[in-house]
Amino acid sequence: MTRIAAVHGVLAPHRHVQREITDMVARHCLPAGADRRVLDRLHRGALVRSRHTALPLDRYGALDDFGAVNDAFIAGAVELGAEAVAGALDEAGLSPRDVDLLVFTSVTGIAAPSVDARLAGRLGLRPDVRRLPLFGLGCVAGAAGIARLHDHLRGWPDHVAVLLSVELCSLTFQRADASPANLVATALFGDGAAAVVACGARRHTAASGPTVVASRSHLYPDTERLLGWDITGSGFRVVLDPAVPDVVRKNLAGDVDGFLSDHGLTRRDVTAWVSHAGGPKVLDAVTEALDLPEDALDVSRASLAEVGNLSSSSVLHILRDTLTAGRRPPAGTPGLLLAMGPGFCTELVLLRW
């Protein structure tokens, strides 16, 4: 089986409490003299205490050119990405030249050559390293990325595969956009990165991380406009439909139950739920749909409060936090990692701790 050898998360360099970000959004998104009570309510309701940003807050008001924004994305993604991969390899006791596959995912910027290509020489990866850059999966890509590592390592069990997620959500900030979707997005999303190192069944490692048993993808018909981007002259304009939690409530239980049943398991057998921190309403919907105890998603809620929603990096930070001392589930028991994203879709990954 695929074994997760290390998970390493990093955050963008500038930390701000929620009130500072709310004030910045009010200055740049609301008309002069506008009533900001709706904005304040949305930002309080996100239950986010602090977030990290790629740039100092006073730089965002001047970012009105998509090219300049994307240049900032590339520079920030390379820096955070290098830190995340180097940290994960160090924790796994492996060197950059051990890496056979590097999967890179982000939905907050674009690059050609891709960020993984820009990192290869800097990190010291082999010239024959296989690379797979992904775009468009959004928040689901952390879970889907682990699933794709597992797919590769089933076919190449002597390989080492790395997933790198970098999301600089603050760089998608849309000035003068007072739409509910944009105001909600400015309340939730933060900047960070994470790297996962995984080893195939025939690759000997001293790592004691969980094994990946299986994964399953679900794409729901006629939901394309629930979540994603509209690409505009000023960059990425968020699409965020308030019906997202309802879709989760309607579909998630059946998807999870069917997946677990195929492996002789039920929800009661799962000792830890590693859920993407999409926001309070999404976490409530997951809890209600699966009839989980109120504290089942405490690690996800704590991550949301401390760093916000990191898009695809979020569930990887939560996996890392779940594996820390005092939180790690009993060895050999099942765990379920799950995330949702544009499509609308979910990705489920069955783990064994």
What name fits each language-model region?
Residues 134, 141-148, 168-191:
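Active-site glycine-rich loop that binds ribose-phosphate moieties when present
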Residues 42, 46-125, 131, 136, ...:
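Conserved beta-ketoacyl condensing-enzyme motif
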Residues 111-118, 163-184, 214-233, 279-288, ...:
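Active-site-adjacent elements of ketosynthase-type condensing enzymes
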Residues 1-75, 160, 175-250, 254-258, ...:
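Condensing-enzyme catalytic core mediating Claisen C-C bond formation in acyl metabolism
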Residues 15-18, 113-117, 144-147, 172-177, ...:
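Short acidic, glycine/serine/threonine-rich loops at helix termini
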